[in-house]
Every structure is written in structure tokens, then in C-alpha cells.
UniProtKB/Swiss-Prot annotation:
It is found in: Mitochondrion inner membrane. The chain crosses the membrane at residues 16-34, 41-66, 73-105, 129-152, 156-183, 191-223, 233-256. This is Cytochrome c oxidase subunit 3. PROSITE patterns: COX3. It comes from the Eukaryota. GO terms for cellular component: mitochondrial inner membrane; respiratory chain complex IV. Residues 1-15, 67-72, 153-155, 224-232 are mitochondrial matrix. The lineage of its organism: Eukaryota, Metazoa, Chordata, Craniata, Vertebrata. InterPro entries: Cyt_c/ubiquinol_Oxase_su3, Cyt_c_oxase_su3_dom, Cyt_c_oxidase-like_su3, Cyt_c_oxidase_su3-like_sf, Cyt_c_oxidase_su3_a-hlx. It comes from Tragelaphus scriptus. One of its GO terms (biological process) is respiratory chain complex IV assembly.
Length: 261
């Protein structure tokens, strides 16, 4: 490696941005094909390409940070700014869904029956599965904080236990959400209520799956001693993301499940 007199990481040429963009194109095109022609071939191809890209790209980043020492404090600072901006963009993303929901519910049109929920819609009871889901995610927020503090204090086993509990709670939340969707008395086709409900909660569920994936990767990295008490931004970013998912769910619960019912 050539000698450099600065702390920045000069990344080597990589094919993964190209394959990542290709997978995004395949997934969005595949989603359209699935909706309109009931064909999932392109969607499955896009998902497979996306998962392979993520695996290989993360593998490269882990190699560069953990084994080659490219993630200096200056580089980590840049990564922190990047993660903060990413979470801000996600906040704006969900703001659009809440805007659509409140735009429709605060002034229901005559087509909706002049009331909210619209005529003919039987909303879910917010004190049943949604309340359990809220408890599960709040508990996972406590356990991920426990894992983070254990890591900073050098308690490796406690960190692994807390992280495993968080992952288990995330998987449990996903299963509860899937059962709720299966038993829901309305569908995404049931007007503005169905579409705002399933798009907002569905995208949140997707973020829970993504966050759980981040945490699973961190769990296996910790098993291989990749994190230290002072060098663990990969885990820290996953924890930030998980707290974001928690907060979004609280807004979803209060707005769509409780107030909206």
C-alpha cells in the first residue's frame, strides 16, 4: 500500500455500487410486474441480487475497518454524519405517510362517509396485538441500550446476551405484525384507510426486518471479537437505527392504531 499523509480512507474501485443500483432497478421493476401481472420473477431476482450485494459490500467494509485499519477517527466521524443524515431522510420518508394519513382523516370527504374510520371499515383494537407490539419494541429499546453500555464497559458476554434478546424481540414483533396482517378485516385495497394503514405499518415492518438484519450481523461480528469498547461504530449505527424504528412505531401506534380507530 502506498504511503499517505492524511487520515482519510481512499476507497479502492468496487463493483458493489453498480450491482446495488441494478438490484434496486430489478426490485422496483419487479414490484410493478408483481402488482400488474402477478409475476414475481424480476422481484425475486432483484431481492437475490440485493442480498448478495449487501453481503459482499459489508464483507469489504468489515475487512477495511477491522483488519486493515482504514476507519480512523476522521473516517468514523464522516460515517457518523452519514448515518445521521440517513436517519433524517428516513424521518422525512415517514413524514410523508403521516401527512397522507392526517390529510385524509382530519377532514374526511363525503366519499368516505364524512367520518373516520371510513364507513364499512372495522379498525383493529389498539389494546390487543398493537399494544403488545408496542411493549415488545419498547423492551427491545431497553435491551439494545443494555447491549451498548455493556460493550462500552467491556462486558462482552452481557453485550451478546442483550443483543440476542433484542434480535429475538425484533423477530417476535415481525411475527406478530404478520399475524395481524393475516387476520385484519380490511386490505390495502380498501380505500384510503387500507392504503395508508398498510403502507405506513408495512414500511415500518420492513425497517424492523432491516434493523434486525443489522443486529444479526453485529451479533456474529461480536462473536468474532470485531468490536472493542472504543471502536464499534458498526454496532452504534445499528443501535441508532433501532431506536429510530422504536420512535416511529410509537407515532404509528398513537396516530393510526389509537387515535385513528
Amino acid at each position: 500500500m502506498t504511503h499517505q499523509t492524511h487520515a482519510y480512507h481512499m476507497v479502492n474501485p468496487s463493483p458493489w455500487p453498480l450491482t446495488g443500483a441494478l438490484s434496486a432497478l430489478l426490485m422496483t421493476s419487479g414490484l410493478t410486474m408483481w402488482f400488474h401481472f402477478n409475476s414475481m420473477i424480476l422481484l425475486m431476482l432483484g431481492l437475490t441480487t440485493n442480498m448478495l450485494t449487501m453481503y459482499q459490500w459489508w464483507r469489504d467494509i468489515i475487512r477495511e475497518s477491522t483488519f486493515q485499519g482504514h476507519h480512523t477517527p476522521v473516517v468514523q466521524k464522516g460515517l457518523r454524519y452519514g448515518m445521521i443524515l440517513f436517519i433524517i431522510s428516513e424521518v422525512l420518508f415517514f413524514t410523508g405517510f403521516f401527512w397522507a394519513f392526517y390529510h385524509s382523516s382530519l377532514a374526511p370527504t363525503p366519499e368516505l362517509g364524512g367520518c373516520w374510520p371510513p364507513t364499512g371499515i372495522h379498525p383493529l383494537n389498539p389494546l390487543e396485538v398493537p399494544l403488545l407490539n408496542t411493549s415488545v419494541l419498547l423492551a427491545s429499546g431497553v435491551s439494545i441500550t443494555w447491549a451498548h453500555h455493556s460493550l462500552m464497559e467491556g462486558h462482552r458476554n452481557h453485550m451478546l446476551q442483550a443483543l440476542f434478546i433484542t434480535i429475538a424481540l425484533g423477530v417476535y414483533f415481525t411475527l406478530l405484525q404478520a399475524s395481524e396482517y393475516y387476520e385484519a378485516p380490511f386490505t390495502i385495497s380498501d380505500g384510503v384507510y387500507g392504503s395508508t394503514f398498510f403502507v405506513a405499518t408495512g414500511f415500518h415492518g420492513l425497517h424492523v426486518i432491516i434493523g434486525s438484519t443489522f443486529l444479526i450481523v453485529c451479533f456474529f461480528r461480536q462473536l468474532k471479537f470485531h468490536f472493542t469498547s472504543s471502536h464499534h461504530f458498526g454496532f452504534e449505527a445499528a443501535a441508532w437505527y433501532w431506536h429510530f424504528v422504536d420512535v416511529v412505531w410509537l407515532f404509528l401506534y398513537v396516530s393510526i392504531y389509537w387515535w385513528g380507530s
